[in-house]
C-alpha cells in the first residue's frame, strides 16, 4: 500500500512508438546533449554554474531518467503545438510561440512532462469517450498556455494576461496542482477509467480535514 512517506509513484504515459522510444533517444542524444538541454534556458543560454547544473541533473533522477523525461517533453511539445494551431490558427504569432516555448521548457526542466500528458489524457477521455462535463479550469493552472492548448483548461491566459509563474516557478520548487471539475454523475466514470488505464496501485483518493479552535468553532456555530 502507498504511504505518505513513500516516494511519488508516477505512472508512465504510453507514447506512440511511431513518435519515438527511449532506446532510440539513447542512440540519438548524448549525456552532454541532455546536460545542456536541461541546465540552459529556453534560448540555449547558460544560466547556472557547473555545480548547480550537476545537482539539478541528479535531482531529476540522473541521465537514466532524463532520456524518458526528454521523450515525454518532446511528445508534449507536439501535442501542445497541435493544440495551439487549433486554438490560435495555423500561423502562430510571436507572443504565442514564445509563451509556449517558455512554458514547455519550464515543464521539461522541472521533470513534469509526464504529469501533463496524463492529465490531458484523462480530461480528453472524459470529454470525448465518457460524455462527462469538465469545468473550464480554475486556480493557477488557468495561467498556463500549454494547459489551454492541451485542452486541460478552456481559458486563454494570453488574452487575459494571466501569469504562468503563479502555476509553475523554477525558483519555488513545488508539484503542479491542477484543479479539475467533473460533473457529479461522471466523476466516478473518470476515476474508473484512470484506474483501469494506469493501474489501481497508481491511483489514490486524498482527503484533508480542517479543525477549528474553540473561539472560531463558537463563532461558526453562531452563524447557523
Regions found by a protein language model. Give the residues of each.
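Phosphodiester-processing cores and adjacent nucleic acid-binding clamps
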Residues: 1-224
Amino acid at each position: 500500500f502507498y504511504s505518505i512517506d513513500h516516494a511519488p509513484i508516477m505512472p508512465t504515459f504510453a507514447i506512440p512508438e511511431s513518435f519515438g522510444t527511449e532506446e532510440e533517444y539513447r542512440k540519438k542524444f548524448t549525456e552532454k546533449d541532455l546536460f545542456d538541454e536541461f541546465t540552459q534556458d529556453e534560448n540555449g543560454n547558460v544560466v547556472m554554474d557547473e555545480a548547480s547544473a550537476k545537482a539539478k541533473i541528479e535531482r531529476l533522477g540522473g541521465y537514466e531518467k532524463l532520456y524518458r523525461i526528454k521523450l515525454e517533453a518532446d511528445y508534449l511539445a507536439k501535442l501542445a503545438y497541435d493544440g495551439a494551431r487549433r486554438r490560435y490558427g495555423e500561423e502562430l504569432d510571436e507572443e504565442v510561440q514564445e509563451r509556449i516555448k517558455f512554458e514547455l521548457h519550464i515543464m521539461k526542466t522541472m521533470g513534469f512532462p509526464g504529469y501533463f500528458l496524463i492529465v490531458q489524457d484523462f480530461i480528453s477521455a472524459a470529454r470525448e469517450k465518457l460524455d462527462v462535463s469538465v469545468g473550464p479550469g480554475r486556480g493557477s493552472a488557468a495561467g498556463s498556455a500549454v494547459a489551454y492548448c492541451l485542452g486541460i483548461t478552456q481559458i486563454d491566459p494570453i488574452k487575459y494576461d494571466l501569469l504562468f509563474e503563479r502555476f509553475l516557478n523554477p525558483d519555488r520548487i513545488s508539484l503542479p496542482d491542477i484543479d479539475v471539475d467533473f460533473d457529479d454523475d461522471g466523476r466516478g466514470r473518470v476515476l474508473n477509467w484512470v484506474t483501469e488505464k494506469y493501474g489501481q496501485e497508481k491511483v489514490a483518493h486524498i482527503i484533508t480535514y480542517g479543525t477549528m479552535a474553540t473561539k472560531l468553532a463558537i463563532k461558526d456555530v453562531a452563524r447557523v
